[in-house]
Swiss-Prot record:
It comes from the Eukaryota. GO terms for biological process: cytoplasmic translation. InterPro entries: Ribosomal_eL31, Ribosomal_eL31_CS, Ribosomal_eL31_dom_sf. Belongs to the eukaryotic ribosomal protein eL31 family. This is Large ribosomal subunit protein eL31. The keyword Ribosomal protein applies. One of its GO terms (molecular function) is structural constituent of ribosome. Pfam families: Ribosomal_L31e (PF01198). GO terms for cellular component: cytosolic large ribosomal subunit.
Length: 122
């Protein structure tokens, strides 16, 4: 077999990036008991962010947490628009180099929205 002449490209996992997603929470917490719906919704958002951004360290912003809990523990909003930011960890002694910050994006109508790469404000 002939050797490959292609160069290895740089991994995109190590880059700092920001994206916006719509998460359909209603489908993810279907069948969960009424007193565990809001905590499970937070867990599902963290799981979604972990898969999409490929980081183990996921942090949820307080505004997103308050939006999920705004209608109580039982009546979680059906959908939420979130901004996932993969960032560099400032701690020198941390195990992971990168973490993901989940922030809330206010949205009234979810129709026609797609996943969007956002230019970094930093």
């Amino acid at each position: 077999m002939a050797p490959k002449n292609e160069k290895k490209s740089r991994s995109t996992i190590n880059e700092v990036v920001t994206r916006e997603y719509t998460i359909h929470i209603h489908a993810r917490i279907r069948g969960i008991g009424s007193k565990k719906r809001a905590p499970r919704a937070i867990d599902e958002i963290k799981k979604f962010a972990k898969i999409q951004m490929k980081t183990n360290d996921v942090r949820v912003d307080t505004k997103l947490n308050k939006f999920i809990w705004s209608k109580g523990i039982k009546n979680v909003p059906y959908r939420v628009r979130v901004r996932l930011s993969r960032r560099r960890n400032e701690d020198e002694d941390s195990a992971q180099k990168l973490y993901t910050l989940c922030t809330y994006v206010p949205c009234t109508n979810f129709h026609g929205l797609t996943n969007v790469n956002v230019d970094s404000e930093e």
